[in-house]
């Protein structure tokens, strides 16, 4: 097998994501006829420090959300630069893409254009070598199946309802294999639907497949989930824990946290009190973006108060960016990073962020976006890097289920080598 296999063509197109907005899909063609394809996700609640997602802004087409400019950047500018390069040299190709753009935030070509190419290159290389993507990226040590962080009640920017907190999730930590954990999550999901129905709540779903009922309070979301866990025959605090994505930057206004639906306006210290009360009352194991992306002091306070008890995940805070993560590590802020490929824009930079987190003793949670496609790259990525946790929505809506199904296939392929760490995925928390 050749050690240098040329890229002979790169083709991008505009396709639709799960929220009915356009996104970029890229195909990379190799000299032997091999093809690699990747589609790029898109977020609803986005951090201000994320790499730039290039949109057309033409209100007459897709409400201004078209990506024809990004597609043209791939087909014209990027293709010309990477045709002839060795598909097996991912780091060099990603470096070429970054330099070709020339901006700090990938605002010239668009992170959606660059990421589509970066991921399609990796997929083409894996296909050429005849190996699964997770093995191509991670090598022989890629064997850890992740604990799912399943979003089963949606609020905030992901739903049109009365809940301020964006995501309420279940984590099946008390099981010894991935497939059994997924089954338990599915059973809790169905039990939750019945529970909501019995209380007269809507069972319509949000962007990520979770239910989006008009609950009486944010806390009621946790309470109905705990009820559903028990109805499904499982024990909260043993087999299942709760994870929350507060997405607090969305309700951070003039230095205060405004929980509109609860009629509360809180200081950073009061917001920490709010979450500490929940942690003491409920089996919560993870809180994402509990403080706003600009509130470093609030983050510091939250980490001091809760950092040994629960996983504190930085999403908008870190945006998969090694510079911001380095600052957080130096300040002793958070203890985990959310990994979103399109926040930074290349596979290589994503892997660098995960490596930095691991060296600092931070966990890494590989994540989808609210606007997804059938692309399953993140399922392979989470196994490739042995991250141990994945956040990819409810066990509903095919763009979410596609990732779980890919993980089920990987689990089967790995066989006895596969590991499911359960509670041990939270290696930096007090037991």
UniProtKB/Swiss-Prot annotation:
It is an enzyme of class 4 (lyase). One of its GO terms (molecular function) is magnesium ion binding. It comes from the Bacteria. It catalyses: (2R)-2-phosphoglycerate = phosphoenolpyruvate + H2O. Signal peptide: none annotated. The keyword Secreted applies. This is Enolase.
């Amino acid at each position: 097998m050749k050690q240098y296999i040329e890229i002979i063509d790169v083709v991008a197109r505009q396709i639709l994501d799960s929220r009915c907005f356009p996104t970029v899909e890229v195909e990379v063609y190799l000299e032997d006829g091999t093809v690699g394809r990747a589609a790029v996700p898109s977020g609803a609640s986005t951090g201000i420090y994320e790499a730039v997602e290039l949109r057309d802004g033409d209100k007459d087409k897709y409400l201004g959300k078209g990506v024809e400019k990004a597609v043209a950047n791939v087909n014209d500018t990027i293709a010309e630069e990477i045709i002839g390069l060795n598909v097996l040299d991912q780091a060099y190709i990603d470096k070429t893409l970054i330099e070709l753009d020339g901006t700090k935030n990938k605002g010239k070509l668009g992170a959606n254009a660059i990421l589509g190419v970066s991921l399609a290159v990796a997929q083409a290389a894996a296909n050429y070598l005849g190996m699964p993507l997770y093995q191509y990226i991670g090598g022989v040590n890629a064997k850890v199946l992740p604990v799912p962080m399943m979003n089963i009640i949606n609020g905030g920017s992901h739903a049109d309802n009365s809940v301020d907190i964006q995501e309420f999730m279940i984590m099946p930590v008390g099981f010894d294999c991935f497939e059994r954990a997924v089954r338990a999550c599915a059973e809790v999901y169905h039990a939750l639907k019945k529970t909501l129905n019995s209380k007269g709540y809507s069972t319509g779903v949000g962007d990520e497949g979770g239910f989006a009922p008009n609950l009486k309070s944010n806390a009621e979301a946790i309470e109905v989930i705990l009820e559903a866990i028990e109805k499904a025959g499982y024990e909260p605090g043993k087999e299942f824990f709760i994870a929350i994505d507060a997405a607090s930057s969305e309700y951070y206004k003039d230095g205060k946290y405004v929980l509109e639906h609860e009629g509360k306006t809180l200081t950073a210290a009061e917001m920490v009190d709010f979450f500490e009360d929940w942690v003491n009352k409920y089996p919560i194991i993870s809180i994402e973006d509990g403080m706003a992306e600009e509130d470093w002091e609030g983050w510091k306070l939250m980490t001091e108060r809760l950092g040994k008890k629960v996983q504190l995940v930085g999403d908008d805070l870190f945006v998969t960016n090694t510079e911001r993560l380095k600052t957080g590590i130096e300040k002793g802020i958070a203890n985990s990073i959310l990994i979103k490929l399109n926040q930074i824009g290349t596979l290589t930079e994503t892997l660098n962020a995960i490596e930095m987190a691991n060296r600092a003793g931070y966990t890494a949670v590989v994540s989808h976006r609210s606007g997804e496609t059938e692309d399953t790259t993140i399922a392979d990525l989470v196994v490739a890097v042995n991250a141990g946790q994945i956040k990819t929505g409810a066990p509903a809506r095919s763009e979410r289920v596609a990732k779980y199904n890919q993980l089920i296939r990987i689990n089967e392929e790995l066989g006895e080598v596969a590991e499911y760490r359960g509670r041990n995925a939270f290696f930096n928390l007090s037991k």
